[in-house]
A protein has these predicted regions:
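Conserved small helical "lid"/interfacial subdomain of P-loop NTPases
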Residues: 1-7, 14-20, 25
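Short acidic, glycine/proline-enriched loop segments that cap or flank alpha-helices
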Residues: 2, 91-92, 109-112, 134
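Amphipathic alpha-helical interaction segments
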Residues: 6, 10, 24, 79, ...
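Amphipathic alpha-helical segments within well-ordered protein domains
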Residues: 9-12, 105
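Winged-helix-like regulatory helical subdomains adjacent to P-loop NTPase cores
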Residues: 23-109
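Short amphipathic alpha-helical interaction segments
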Residues: 107-129
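Short, Lys/Arg-rich nucleic-acid/phosphate-binding segment
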Residues: 134-143
Length: 174
């Protein structure tokens, strides 16, 4: 079997260097191609693989994501968490609130300042919303990273599935 270069790049981008998601997305994309009697994987097969991978994700990831984003009221928790997943991390996987601002502004199609979502970041570090993020540093200089490295790609793929971002990890509203 062979794979389209764009499909290969998409799998690498979505898996964010984690073998777990690289293998999972590849497996489901190749299975999709084989199930339709093709020996070549296309980008559409990867899109289908995203849905399958999300449906078969570890229950602990799904439960933590649900706890982090679920609320009876209208809120920004899922958008802020997606923005965290899209934020540019440092070499250790940490990002700051400043790094979250740009993806959130693009995602919501309006400017957001740090005070508008800083309580969300702090909540993600507490048991009531996860904890989905780890926090290090001191006040006004906090750095965050995902508690479980498998959560970040899951959040991105869920954003694609929900139509919040496109396959190129850009806002679907732009």
């Amino acid at each position: 079997m062979t794979i389209n270069e764009d499909a290969k790049k998409k799998i690498a981008l979505l898996s964010q260097g984690l073998p777990h998601y690289t293998h999972l997305l590849s497996l489901y994309a190749f299975q999709r191609a084989a199930s339709t009697d093709r020996s070549h994987v296309e980008i559409g097969d990867v899109r289908t693989a995203i849905d399958t991978a999300l449906a078969k994700t570890q229950q602990s990831i799904i439960s933590t994501y649900h706890r982090a984003t679920n609320s009876p009221r209208e809120n920004l928790y899922s958008q802020v968490l997606l923005s965290c997943a899209l934020a540019q991390p440092d070499s250790l996987g940490y990002f700051s609130a400043v790094d979250v601002r740009k993806p959130l502004t693009i995602l919501m199609n309006k400017p957001y300042e740090i005070p508008a979502f800083s309580q969300h970041l702090n909540a993600f570090c507490e048991f009531s919303r996860g904890p989905v993020l780890q926090r290090t540093g001191t006040a006004r200089r906090f750095r965050f990273r995902f508690e479980n490295p498998l959560m970040q790609p899951y959040v991105v793929m869920d954003g694609i599935r929900k139509g919040l971002i496109n396959d190129d990890l850009k806002s679907s509203k732009s």
